[in-house]
Amino acid sequence: TVVDLSKATVFPTHFTLNYGLYALFLKQTKCGDLRYGRQMYDYQEGTVTSFAPGQVVEVKLNDGVRPMSHGILFHPDLIRGTSLGQEIKHYSFFSYASNEALHLSDDEKKIFQDCLDKVQQELSRPIDKHSKRLIARNIELLLDYCMRFYERQFVTRSKVNKDVLMKFEDLLDVYFQSEQSPNEKLPTVKYFADKVNLSSNYFGDLIKKETGKTAQEYIQGKIINIAKERILASEKTVSEIAYELGFQYPQHFTRIFKKVVGCTPTEYRVIQV
């Protein structure tokens, strides 16, 4: 269904929604706070918020502020057996991990509304054998545009993104700078995302956009480079180096090293010498 929340007649000020549907809303005003999972949802006027089945959203409306937003809600059953049903998992803005809203330009808002209008037009027609497919395709068109806007958001925030990448590099250096204090575990994408105040999903998309590598691949590459330095610059055993880097089991370190470098750490030491 296509909805216009400005036409609502009842405005509870504090409630929790357990979504059994997919939902996208273009917010025309910030009417209060949204808690999405365990985090606050970053949204302002002119942004798109998105939710998926099974997700829980806590809403606190500001007194005297009417919700002003247009959007669409659709049940998973609507897209089963369609191309959208197969692709829905690739729209990363539906993830719980993505708590950053999509910020739209004026032209993008018009495109968003046009897609809603197309869905509404189809919903207003008598149902026939083409209805489900056409509705699903128009929803898919809307989601594809949102993915384009989402990627555009990375481009227009390029300077900010590069600052995040530099901060990521610094954090990696700090994490591994001390050989005297072995790390208790390998660093995770979430660890670094939290450090730069981004969700893991958004941080991962940003790093992928800037480097061509996933955040996990980038971390792994850093670990391998540091491992190479320590293998050649010291007489420490492979096990000692593995523990310093945060590997619980040396054989895990050896397996990853060989996969990336093409030889074991011991073989690498012999070859380089």
Provide a role label for each language-model segment:
Residues 209-248, 270-273:
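Terminal helix-turn-helix DNA-binding modules in bacterial transcription factors
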Residues 158-196, 217-236:
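A short, Lys/Arg-enriched amphipathic alpha-helix from helix-turn-helix/homeodomain DNA-binding modules
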Residues 38-50:
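Short acidic-glycine-tyrosine-enriched beta hairpin
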Residues 62-127:
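A hydrophobic/aromatic-rich effector-binding and dimerization subdomain
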Residues 1-41:
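Generic protein-terminus/edge-of-domain signal
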Residues 254-273:
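…primarily DNA-binding HTH/wHTH and HhH modules…
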Residues 46, 191-198, 203, 207, ...:
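Append "Primarily bacterial transcriptional regulators
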Residues 110-170:
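An amphipathic alpha-helical interaction segment
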